């Protein structure tokens, strides 16, 4: 089936297309299947697996042909995938960038080829914001703030300093940078909250466990709170805490982000205190954005997903509603 982007446009239609798009490239509004090239970070967490499943199931439902690439958490693999999509002349490129920087050159190549780019889940740092059309996903700074607000509200009765250890996400990634920023912004209001250790766990359970073991060896019972940038690291850390003879969720307050089923199971077991939602189910929103481009519509620069926060006491009630 021919890609609609290769169909011949009349001069009048082409002129109208440019006028509607404000000078930015768009797929044309002709018939035929839309081909979307998508580069995924990898499969580092339960969240990412659900995100991939959402995109892969939403594409055929929307009548979109998906060309999918797994970067195995390496930026060089994502850049190769984007260049492959450009060479294949896909209609739209979408990707979730493993880190924020280092994309300028390949995004300029996509723009030169008149292939629009949509970001999902994570942002990029580029000098020219026209290199991508839209970012679909969560407000990571606000997620960090939600975690911080919950901590302040739920430790009012605890006297003295509160020592926090932090499991950061992948170094240089948007969620790691922004969740840290939002959390630090909120706890700065009370000097008694002190981050005594902070290290990357790379968003994985195995690394989360390994780093938490090091935190416990260095600080032991001085640790009052663990703030993990995602649920998988928190779940790994829970294992380390238990192996150290302590009770997660009681001896150490544990706050994490994502809202995956594993986190709800940990809360039901009394081992995790709260999870801040970060929905991976971006597939339908992405496919709608791609179809809107085909129809000649201009996308909002930022499309933010609506998300909540789930403390331990609501976990059992909410668990049957979880889709990931």
Predicted regions and their residues:
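Short, low-complexity disordered leader/linker segments with a strong preference
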Residues: 1-35, 60, 108-115, 317
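Hydrophobic alpha-helical segments within soluble ligand-binding/sensing domains
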Residues: 30, 36, 78, 135-162, ...
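Flexible loop/hinge segments that line or gate small-molecule binding clefts
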Residues: 101, 105-142, 163, 260-266, ...
């Amino acid at each position: 089936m021919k890609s609609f982007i290769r169909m011949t446009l009349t001069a009048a239609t082409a002129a109208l297309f440019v006028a509607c798009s404000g000078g930015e490239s768009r797929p044309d509004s002709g018939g035929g299947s839309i081909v979307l090239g998508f580069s995924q970070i990898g499969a580092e967490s339960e969240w990412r697996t659900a995100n991939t499943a959402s995109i892969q199931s939403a594409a055929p439902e929307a009548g979109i042909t998906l060309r999918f690439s797994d970067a195995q958490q390496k930026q060089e693999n994502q850049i190769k995938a984007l260049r492959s999509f450009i060479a294949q002349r896909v209609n739209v490129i979408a990707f979730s960038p493993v880190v924020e920087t280092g994309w300028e050159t390949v995004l300029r190549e996509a723009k030169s080829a008149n292939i629009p780019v949509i970001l999902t889940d994570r942002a990029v740092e580029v000098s020219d914001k026209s290199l991508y059309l839209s970012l679909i996903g969560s407000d990571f700074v606000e997620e960090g703030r939600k975690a911080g607000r919950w901590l302040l509200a739920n430790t009012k009765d605890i006297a003295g300093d509160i020592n926090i250890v932090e499991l950061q996400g992948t170094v240089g990634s948007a969620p790691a940078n922004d969740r840290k920023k939002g959390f630090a912004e909120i706890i700065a209001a009370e000097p008694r909250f002190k981050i005594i250790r902070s290290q990357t766990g790379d968003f994985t359970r195995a690394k989360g466990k390994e780093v938490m073991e090091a935190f416990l060896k260095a600080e032991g019972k001085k640790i009052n709170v663990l703030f993990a940038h995602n649920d998988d690291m928190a779940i790994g850390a829970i294992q380390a805490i238990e192996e150290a003879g302590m009770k997660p969720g009681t001896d150490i307050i544990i706050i994490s982000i994502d809202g995956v089923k594993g986190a709800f199971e940990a809360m039901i077991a009394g081992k995790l205190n709260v999870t801040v939602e970060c929905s991976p189910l971006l597939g339908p929103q992405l496919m709608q954005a791609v179809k809107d481009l085909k129809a000649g519509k201009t996308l909002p620069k930022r499309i933010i997903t609506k998300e909540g926060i789930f403390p331990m006491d609501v976990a059992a009630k909410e668990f049957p509603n979880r889709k990931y």
